[in-house]
Amino acid sequence: MKVKRSKIVPLIFIAPLLVVVSGVASLSNYFTPEYTNTWPAMFIQSALVYAYYLLPFSMIVVCVMIAGRETGNNGILKMLALPVSRCALSIAKFCVLTFYLFMEMVVFLVVFVIAGLIATQTMEVTETLPILYLLKWCLGLFLTMLPCIAAMWAITVLFEKPLLSVGLNLLLVIPGVLVANTPLWIAYPYCYSGYLVSCSLHDFTAETSDAAFSVFPFLPCAIVVFGLFFALAVTQFGKKEMR
């Protein structure tokens, strides 16, 4: 993969920095030394917009940049000439995309912890850092984003022109927050991560131990959605160039 000299790595820092710094800074003004549940409040404040919009937006750009590394100078044809199947190449590229998603989640977690520690110490809040809570929700964001990036990658593969793939993916991301409030959310991968954070917000405000996010029937449906888009991307990758 020719991503060593690309601008993808700096890109994945932008969204976490923007959303965490703004979210923690706006909420920290209301903190007092007696404030409870500080970390969950900061996390939900930061993750809500991030999960619905900034994380998907950044992954759309990463998809296009990964695909664009091979479109210049007939790089895709040179790659397809290698003794490796098209399916294997497409799977390899999707694995790279997944790795960048994982990297961005790590960046989000690290930036959030640093910003949160600064905010709590500044406002003299003595609440312990709930690292397991943060790891659980970051892992949840990562897993629920997998069907979404599978759909993004399939669209990137199907549409050769970056403008078309970016435009279509953006059009699918934008109504995610609306679809999340309907029964159709379960079949709409672009809102999965945002719906997860919305459920955590519901649990936080209701102060209940009963999670609003139900694994079933979400998990089987998400696996089917992921499988369909992944299979589409794998089978269609490089098909036009091989004709």
Where do the protein language model's features map onto the residues?
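Helix-loop-helix units of permease transmembrane domains in multi-pass membrane transporters
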Residues: 66-98
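Secretory targeting signals
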Residues: 15-61, 91-158, 204-205, 209-219
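Transmembrane alpha-helical segments in integral membrane proteins
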Residues: 57-71, 76, 146-163, 223-239
